[in-house]
Amino acid sequence: ILGPDRSPIEVDETMAEPEIPTVESLGAVGPWLYEPDRAVTQAGLLGAVTAATLGSEVDTGLGYVVSEAHVDVPFARRYAVREVMPFGVKSLRAWLKQHGITGLTIKKRGVRLDDDELRRQLRIGRKAGDGAQATVILTRVAGQQVVLVVDPA
């Protein structure tokens, strides 16, 4: 893996688990989420992330890995999981309001949604303005659409 501000990182199949475990329930989402570098995912080496973190993929084929382990993985970005909830516009809007969130970064995998339409429904912009900024990941966990509120770690 090549990056503009780092030395090359080598990831290969010897680092990967042969079978990638998946999360079995919403309650099994750990406190850490890892987003692999796109090159790792495209090379089919997600098992290297699950092996390095002792984690599980949120749902088959989505690429996000959750774990109980707080480890530095040079080929994945780590997030602290603040909140896990079933996806619903009303419940997410209520959570954002309760926490004073006025700016939102939306990441998604495995969920078909229009970001701009969701922002209109949530009544929230991209920039924080007078409130706080948050990052939400819309994805599936064990087949269920969920929202993971995360902080870069």
PLM regions: where:
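SAM-dependent transferase fold signal centered on methyltransferase-like domains
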Residues: I1-A153
